[in-house]
Every structure is written in structure tokens, then in C-alpha cells.
Amino acid sequence: MSCNLLVILGPTASGKTQLGVELARRLSGEIISADSRQVYRGMDIGTGKDLAEYGDIPYHIIDIVDPGFEFNVFEFQRCFQRAFAHIVNRGRLPVMVGGTGMYLEAVLNRYRFVEVPENADLRRELSTFSDEELAERLKGANPRLHNTTDLLERGRLVRAIEIAEYEDSREPLPLPELAPLIFGIRWERPVLRQRITDRLKARLEQGMIDEIEQLHRSGIPYETLEFYGLEYRFVAKYLKGELNRNDMFQKLNSAIHDFAKRQDNWFRRMERHGTVIHWLEGDGDPLKEAQEILRLNAIPR
């Protein structure tokens, strides 16, 4: 099966969008965003939408819900399936770009998310099981299990069993067959840290504080805004008078650096569990590197 999905992943400020747009332009592609915050309308500077970068390239799963809507990985997977089918049916190539690891894994590992209620009786029964017994129960309930992430943590094991046994008598929704080619952008740590700091300064100069203040004036409490990511959390604290501007910048900058490390850790974990990522050097020519890998995979450039 030839590649039917291109994926560009990497930590924040790594240049994913730019590369994704360049490849989409060359491959008759369209962007599918895998960013948990860019779905929200009105949250532009703080989420780094950079819509001007897209130019004439169509994009999906950006600006689709209002702040306050609880958008989660279940919603993302449904949106991805619709966008993927829409793009493929018109003979174009989906290019998924993002750094939200859970969203990326949901697609690449073909997680089957359904709205399954908690089963109190089943949970009481499973509470007497060892982790090994839970793992065997899950394998019995889902013999086609290929992704083993759910076997690594007890709470996820229980929930996975709950879902598998709930689904057993139901007709599953079809998931698209994927043949992804995955690129990741990486930088030396000091260089990425400087890119993060420079980008934060630029966003503040572009009016990020005003954007967040306007969201508050539109009726969104500061306490709610704090749940929409680091930028919104620390700027909300500044606007409430809990931090001065310098402390806000320093704490936010440090928090974004830590977030980038967590993203890198997530991507490494994906690799340990079998995801093949072709890493491109950010300080080299990632577009040229990507085109060479595309050539080797016999994908027209």
C-alpha cells in the first residue's frame, strides 16, 4: 500500500507548519492540524496558528469550535476521519501537522474511541485482578490488539477492557486504512530554547496579551482561560495581577521549554513502541531531506 498520509511532528517552535505547507504545496496536499488548541476560534496568537503561512493551502481542524467547548481526542479522531476522507476522495494527499502526541497516536495507532459509560460492576470485579491478569483479560477481549500502550498502566488497562467488552456486541465504525510516512523535526536543545524564547517575544509584541484580555471581555473567566495552555495560563495570571510582566515572561518561557522536553519524550516513546519517524535536522535543509526520503519511498515530489 503506497503512502496515503504524510505526518510532520516535532516540539513547539520547531518549524512544523512551514515544512508541512511546503510539502503540501509540492504534493497536492492539504493540511490536517493535530494541535489540541488550534481548534478554538479567537485563540490565534496564543496558539500559534500562523494562518498566513498556509497561503492557498487548504487546512482542516483549525477554528472549528468556540472556547468553552470540550474538544478531546475522541472529537479529534472523528474530525480527522472526516477530513481524511474529504481530502483523499478528491485525489489529494493529507498532510497531518502537529505536536499533540495523544492526537498523533490516536490516528497512527488507529485507536477506536467510543463513548462508553463506566461500568461500576465490571470495575469492582477487575479491582481484584493483578496487572498480569488484566493484561490477559484485555488480550482476550481484543485479540487483534497491536498497540500495547494500554498494557503499561493499570487505569488504562481497566478502561481498555471496559471499552473492548462494551464494543464486543456492537458493529465497529470503520477506520481508514493508513500507510503513513512520518517526518520529525529536531534541533539541538540550546537552539530550540532560543527559538522558543524568540517566538514568545514576537507573540507578545504581536498582541497576545490583548488577545487574551479580549477573550476575557467576551465572557470567558480567567480561571477557564488557564486551561487552554501555558500562554493563556500565565498571561491570565498577569492580567489578574498575580504576576508582574517580567515574572510572567520568565515563568512562561521556562514552562514552554519544559513542555518542549515533554513533547520530545513523547515522540521517543512512540519510537520505542514501533512508530518509525524519519528525523530531519532543523538547522539543515529539512525540506531537501524530506524530498529525498520521499524519492526513496517512490512518492512523486
Swiss-Prot record:
Top class in the EC scheme: transferase
Catalytic activity, EC: 2.5.1.75
Cofactor: Mg(2+)
Keyword Magnesium: yes
One Pfam family per UniProt: IPPT
GO MF terms held by the record: ATP binding; tRNA dimethylallyltransferase activity
TM stretches of this protein: none
InterPro entries cross-referenced by the UniProt entry: Dimethylallyltransferase, IPT, P-loop_NTPase
Superkingdom assignment: Bacteria
Catalyzed reactions per annotation: adenosine(37) in tRNA + dimethylallyl diphosphate = N(6)-dimethylallyladenosine(37) in tRNA + diphosphate
Residues where substrate binds: T12, A13, S14, G15, K16, T17
Binding of ATP, residues: G10, P11, T12, A13, S14, G15, K16, T17
Any Gene Ontology biological process: tRNA modification
NCBIfam families, A to Z: miaA (TIGR00174)
Its job: Catalyzes the transfer of a dimethylallyl group onto the adenine at position 37 in tRNAs that read codons beginning with uridine, leading to the formation of N6-(dimethylallyl)adenosine (i(6)A).
Name of the featured protein: tRNA dimethylallyltransferase 1
Gene name as annotated: miaA1
